[in-house]
Amino acid sequence: AKATILLMPKFDINSLLALIHKHKVTIAPVVPPIVLAISKSPDLHKYDLSSIRVLKSGGAPLGKELEDTLRAKFPNAKLGQGYGMTEAGPVLTMSLAFAKEPIDVKPGACGTVVRNAEMKIVDPETGHSLPRNQSGEICIRGDQIMKGYLNDGEATERTIDKDGWLHTGDIGYIDDDDELFIVDRLKELIKYKGFQVAPAELEALLLTHPKISDAAVVPMKDEAAGEVPVAFVVISNGYTDTTEDEIKQFISKQVVFYKRINRVFFIDAIPKSPSGKILRKDLRAKIAASVPK
């Protein structure tokens, strides 16, 4: 088997669409920010994207709304999510949509664990294994995981326990059909009065607002609650009259009290890494610089 791989020097949505159109690309690995850019692009109709037959999403949780949007844009393509990390192979699970005999995919599912590995979910505080459908830290064990971090025994010891389980730092759960669902990064969870709030969940809701083209959620220190969720949003062209209260009310109607957005900051663009991941540390720095001590 053989295939041609197209590489882009940097991401630009119109360049991506033009490459697919020109070269009749068939397989597209994407991350959620690229899915967002595709779904929000006003120029999508200018390109023939019918050659796409497989869309694989990874790198971060893909919200149901974005997943549904992508399916609508590419009705003839197989769409699924996968999960993995460099330290472990890297592929750990893959959507059942890509199986030899495809199975209907549940929204948000990342598929089942690969055959040469074991997976379990543990309580991040106690290390005890958790039952199905209960969120905790994802742990993986198998011959494919790394031996350790080069010249960093301390980091290796924190990551791989005495029984050989690699603690991924990701929060997720396994359902009754052995499928994995990702919630968020453990270190990204916002701790509000003992409750845990996943930024990815709020970001997915924010992106359903018709006036928001991009969004990110990070914690802000709060004397009473410990931490509260705050949002950085990019407003779509033509909606400059959008207010902070409008966005806060939009979220409040859909979530329990401890997940409500405390503040909204308007920004020109969400800072992201070359792979499309949100640079949350940059946003936390903006908060530290703008909020009075």
UniProtKB/Swiss-Prot annotation:
SBD2: annotated segments: 82-149
Cofactor: Mg(2+)
Top EC category: ligase
SUPFAM superfamilies: Acetyl-CoA synthetase-like
SBD1: region residues: 12-81
Signal peptide location: none
Binding site for CoA: K10, K193, G194
GO process annotations (BP): phenylpropanoid metabolic process
Any coiled-coil regions, as ranges: none
S-S bridge residues: none
Recorded domain comment: Both substrate-binding domains (SBD1 and SBD2) are involved in the substrate recognition, and are sufficient to confer the substrate specificity.
Name recorded for this polypeptide: 4-coumarate--CoA ligase 1
Originating organism: Glycine max
